[in-house]
Design a protein with these regions (language model features):
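A short acidic, Gly/Pro-enriched loop at the edge of an enzyme's catalytic core
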Residues: 92-103
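Class I SAM-dependent methyltransferase Rossmann-like catalytic core
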Residues: 10-21
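A short SAM/SAH-binding and catalytic strip from SAM-dependent methyltransferases
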Residues: 102-116
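Conserved catalytic/acceptor-binding region of the Class I
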Residues: 117, 123-162
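Conserved alpha-helix/loop element of class I SAM-dependent methyltransferases that forms part
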Residues: 21-38
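Class I SAM-dependent methyltransferase SAM/SAH-binding core
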Residues: 41-43, 49-93
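N-terminal, positively charged/glycine-rich alpha-helical extensions of SAM-dependent methyltransferases
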Residues: 1-11
Length: 162
């Protein structure tokens, strides 16, 4: 992700936190269930204000760390999910040692990364039998008001980036 876009969310961190939906419990639980036995050390990459971090932090035995390129988003995350270690970084440049993670997860963030570079970097940081988990919330366009909102959003230049 270009540096200017990577750090553009922080100015609106409070609005981002208020406006982004939480991740459904069942989806997060499923993602955690498929982790290798004994897996505990998980990095939430592109963690933002901590929506996914918060959900994983409550999992028994989880040792979550949060990584984001935007210092303001990490500041909001530290308020929202106290006690979680935070690091400046990206999926293409993880600030962690080789083979130090059991899993890397990205919530609504994979579309911001260079998938080839990110895959190689995640492969470096995750142990050989580790896991990459990707999760998104999607809009239910079968609901009239959601469909109308989607049409409005698709007129936005930001939505075209997705």
């Amino acid at each position: 992700m270009a540096d200017s876009r990577a750090t553009s969310f922080g100015a609106q961190a409070q609005d981002y936190e208020a406006g982004r939906p939480e991740y459904p419990f069942d989806a997060v639980a499923w993602m955690l269930e498929i982790l290798p036995a004994g897996a505990q050390r998980v990095a939430d990459v592109g963690a933002g204000t901590g929506k996914l971090t918060r959900a994983i932090a409550h999992a028994p035995g989880a040792q979550i760390v949060a990584i984001d390129p935007d210092p303001a988003m990490l500041a909001a995350l530290r308020e929202n999910v106290p006690g979680v270690p935070t690091f400046l970084g990206t999926a293409e440049s993880l600030p962690l040692p080789d083979d130090s993670l059991d899993a890397v997860v990205l919530g609504q963030a994979w579309h911001w990364v260079d998938p080839v570079r990110a895959s190689a970097e995640i492969g470096r940081a995750v142990r050989a039998d580790g896991t990459l988990g990707l999760i998104w919330n999607i809009r239910d366009d079968s609901v009239d008001w959601v469909r109308d909102l989607s049409r409005i959003m698709h007129r936005s230049a930001a939505e075209e980036e997705l």
